[in-house]
């Protein structure tokens, strides 16, 4: 596939957020060519993640508008900028909100995926190379979001945030691996590492929590206990391997960690916290068994949050860990997660509960705000 648009400005449709909390507007925008170490992508499928909604609502952070949101997507490389050697036009790719420069100490460490250059930055609305946007309308800039901005038919990303995948993989399924599903799956498989036959508690049964449960199912956990305040999520969660449910509301003043300890003869082997609520974090840590229990924090807290637990909980040989994007390095590791799906070791279809055409993207926001969807697939109408 040779690109006849390379080096030129592309006019295309994008869903622009003009102000906080207001419906997105489909506009014709201009997308500039990729600069040094950048790639321009044709987006084919994108899905809505709660992080998009959070920054669109702009309740807890500095608002930056107009902006093009979106960061879970699949597409095809349209053209590449100077210096890009590992990607070419026609490659099937997933853009990722965090990156891998492959040069820094984090990228060279086998333990970390938190690239110094390209790790997530929710405040930055411009490209790293020159501090400019690649999107504009009527000569005025439209800001980027987490380096991806996939609610546009074309977008420009840093090449370190673009993962080349098996061209046989269906982009309308594997695109969910570019954020939430990998975050939960990797939190379990790469960080909690439950053994076959073990017990695992998952706090929060949204997309990330269900992906964490899927990880526990793949690992062969014998009991997967789902904890959520919304009982309507319990039925769905069974498809992801969850065997038992705890709704904290059903237990009065009894702390959920005590409820779980009583269910499991002293505590679970592993827990994964996916809500970002500090009380849930304490419960997730204190519900693991002494001697070997490991709790993993995934959910993102509010700015001023802090939690406390007695140091004896740690001295009694419990471990508390944190993780970011499931400890996956985007370029090095995500292709193998796609391969897991292709080998039928990982199920993705069950995460995709709704589908809408790009022109109806605001419906995806409605489904998520009402708590009806796990993932809503948005199909571009090129």
Swiss-Prot record:
Co-factor(s): Zn(2+)
GO CC field: cytosol
Binding site for Zn(2+) 1: 49, 51, 71, 179
Binding residues annotated for an alcohol, in chain numbering: 51, 71
Residues engaged in binding Zn(2+) 2: 101, 104, 107, 115
Gene Ontology annotations of biological process type: alkaloid metabolic process; formaldehyde catabolic process
Assigned EC number: 1.1.1.1
Record keywords: Cytoplasm, Metal-binding, NAD, Oxidoreductase, Zinc
Family label: Belongs to the zinc-containing alcohol dehydrogenase family.
Protein name: Alcohol dehydrogenase 1
């Amino acid at each position: 596939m040779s690109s006849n648009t390379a080096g030129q400005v592309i006019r295309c449709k994008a869903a622009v957020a003009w102000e906080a909390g207001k419906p997105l507007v489909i506009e014709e925008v201009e997308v500039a060519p990729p600069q040094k170490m950048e790639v321009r992508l044709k987006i084919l499928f994108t899905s809505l993640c709660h992080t998009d909604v959070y920054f669109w609502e702009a309740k807890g952070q500095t608002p930056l508008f107009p902006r093009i949101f979106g960061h879970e997507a699949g597409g095809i490389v349209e053209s590449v900028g100077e210096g890009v050697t590992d990607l070419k036009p026609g490659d099937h790719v997933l853009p990722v909100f965090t990156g891998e420069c492959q040069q820094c100490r984090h990228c060279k460490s086998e333990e970390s995926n938190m690239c110094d250059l390209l790790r997530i930055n929710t405040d930055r609305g411009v490209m790293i190379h020159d501090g400019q946007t690649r999107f504009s309308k009527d000569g005025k800039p439209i800001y980027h979001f987490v380096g991806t901005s996939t609610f546009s038919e074309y977008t420009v990303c840093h090449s370190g945030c673009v993962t080349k995948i098996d061209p046989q993989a269906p982009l309308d399924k594997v695109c969910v691996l570019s954020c939430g599903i990998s975050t939960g799956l990797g939190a379990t498989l790469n960080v909690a590492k439950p053994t076959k036959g073990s017990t695992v508690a998952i706090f929060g049964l949204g997309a990330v929590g269900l992906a964490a449960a899927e990880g526990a199912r793949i690992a062969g956990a014998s009991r997967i206990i789902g904890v959520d305040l919304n009982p309507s999520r319990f039925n769905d969660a069974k498809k992801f391997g969850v065997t038992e449910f705890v709704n904290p509301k059903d237990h009065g003043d009894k702390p959920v960690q005590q409820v779980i300890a009583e269910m499991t003869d002293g505590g679970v082997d592993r827990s994964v916290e996916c809500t970002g609520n500090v009380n849930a974090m304490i419960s997730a840590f204190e519900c693991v068994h002494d001697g070997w229990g490991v709790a993993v924090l995934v959910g993102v807290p509010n700015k001023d949050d802090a939690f406390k637990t007695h140091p004896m909980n740690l001295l009694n040989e419990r471990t508390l860990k944190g993780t970011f994007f499931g400890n996956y390095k985007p370029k090095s590791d995500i292709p193998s997660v796609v391969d897991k799906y292709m080998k039928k070791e990982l199920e993705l279809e069950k995460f995709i509960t709704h589908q809408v055409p790009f022109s109806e993207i605001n419906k995806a926001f409605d489904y998520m705000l009402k708590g009806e969807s796990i993932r809503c697939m948005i199909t571009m109408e090129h």
